[in-house]
Amino acid sequence: MGNLSVKFGSVEFKNPVIMASGTFGFGKEYNEIYDIQKLGGISSKGLTLNKKPGNNGMRVHETSSGMMNSVGLENPGVQGFIDYELPFFSKLDLVRIANVGGGTLEDYLLGVQMLNDKPIDIIELNISCPNVKAGGMAFGIKNEVAREVVREVRNITKLPLVIKLSPNAEDIVGMAKVCEEEGADGVSLVNTFKAMAIDIKNRRPVFENVYAGLSGPAIKPIALRMVHEVCKNVNIPVMGMGGITKATDAIEFIMAGATCIQVGTANFINPRIGIEIIDGINEFMDREGIKSLDEIRGII
């Protein structure tokens, strides 16, 4: 059996398979189905400074090869996470990632500060959140806006910092370079693509917010290309994601240069997918005589 362990900066993962934020809660429900401590890591449900009820109306809509969501970051807030979810989350024998979002720069800073002394291994900063002081445009669209967020957060935390990039950014490679320049320990990509669906019977958008995030197999080829481009242009490690539903998808992302991979939408299709991907990577390595993932990472 090959060695699945990977080093992401200063953090060691037992294997490269991470459950993506917003698709795995804080792990409790899935732990009733299988031993989630076999996973490499879990990225928590997206946390905001204050508790959020989420969006009204339709939140999830199935597409031909994936799904759209407009959940609206429903979450217990950072303090709620610390009080009610962290006692379970912190005891897991895997890499514990806190995904943090915000509506203002101050929200990001206060949220991360509250987690600084908590048993968290990585902060994953979600810069796809709308900036309420800039007309709702996401922080992760323009490089210089993202630069300020990354710089300020980097200045107030010593925890490993990973920036989750939006595929809707004006220049995703440039965005990754900005994150590296401002001291991020890594980047994760891609988040969901801005998309739309229309209810033709009622002649209105399916979602109250009109647009929603597209994920699932439909986005994989584009996500893979973006991960490959970023990996070729930065010297910090990358967590690759976007449409991964099986072990061969994960292996493609690793061959494109990703150190780790994240699995999101596939959790809704098959709640055991994380374990199946780990087993599939193991089988591939045995079949191909691969001793370490370093042998195939970034070979494309």
From Swiss-Prot:
Substrate binds at K45, N69, S70, V71, G72, L73, N126, N191, T192. It is found in: Cytoplasm. Coiled coil: none annotated. Pfam families: DHO_dh. FMN binds at S21, K45, G46, N99, N126, K164, V190, G216, G242, G243, G264, T265. One of its GO terms (molecular function) is dihydroorotate dehydrogenase (NAD+) activity. It catalyses: (S)-dihydroorotate + NAD(+) = orotate + NADH + H(+). InterPro entries: Aldolase_TIM, DHO_dehydrogenase, DHOD_1B, Dihydroorotate_DH_1, Dihydroorotate_DH_1_2, Dihydroorotate_DH_cat, Dihydroorotate_DH_I. Its cofactor is FMN. The keyword Plastid does not apply. GO terms for biological process: 'de novo' pyrimidine nucleobase biosynthetic process; 'de novo' UMP biosynthetic process. GO terms for cellular component: cytoplasm. It is an enzyme of class 1 (oxidoreductase). The active site is at C129 (nucleophile). Its EC number is 1.3.1.14. Keywords: Cytoplasm, Flavoprotein, FMN, NAD, Oxidoreductase, Pyrimidine biosynthesis. Its main location: cytoplasm. Catalyzes the conversion of dihydroorotate to orotate with NAD(+) as electron acceptor. PANTHER family: DIHYDROOROTATE DEHYDROGENASE (FUMARATE), DIHYDROOROTATE DEHYDROGENASE (QUINONE), MITOCHONDRIAL-RELATED. Heterotetramer of 2 PyrK and 2 PyrD type B subunits. This is Dihydroorotate dehydrogenase B (NAD(+)), catalytic subunit. It comes from Clostridioides difficile (strain 630).
